Amino acid sequence: MIKGFGILEMLISLSLGLGILTVIIAHATETGRIAKKITSNQERLEAIFHTVDTIKSDLNKCGMRLQEACKFFNIPSFESSQGNFKVTYGLAEEELLENALPGQQTLKIAQNEFFKKDKVVLIYNLARQVWEFNEIRDFSGGALVLKNSLQNDFPGNSPVLVLKKVEYKFYPAQRMLKRKTDKGNFQPLLEEVSDFYVTFFPDANSVLYRIEVNKKEQIRGYIFLLNLVQP
């Protein structure tokens, strides 16, 4: 008798080996899929948390430093429509160091790092009941240079506010919520968004927002606009 494995035994052994290898490969593949899914879920959750924090931060700032101007001049600091909302707030405030006359394109104020080129400014005076928006061209020679000539007469000590505007917009076709600041372009904030809406309650100075992701997860937030003053 010849010692060793017969052909049948070798085939059985080979089949068992291939079976074990197939199980190992299948297990490794499934493990990889699970790990990838976990990573994807974690990234989505992080994106959702970041979006919620960003919305909350912007809404909490809405109307900041604009309380006086909004009350007397009916300047909106919150606006909303279907799948869209805008907030405006003041970044910094200075007072005119000298009178500013109609036709003038400079404002004498203390130098402030927030008063940068292309930023929108609000100049107003309660006693004269005048206000207007303008844009910064430059800061030169201790004065703020404006892009447009003044339309009104502003005495010294009139407040000058530099503003920040933030806008959120839902793009249903792209399934994406985007955000932009001032005159910038809309940038992606959250993907796979299947629905987004905002409801403003003027009597309570509050906002309810709802984000739906992949038609499964829903995130709701209710925030009081503590800095918002209505006329």
Specify the residue positions occupied by each region the protein language model found.
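Short linear sequence signals and composition-biased patches located at protein termini or domain-edge surfaces
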Residues: 76-80, 164-167, 172-231
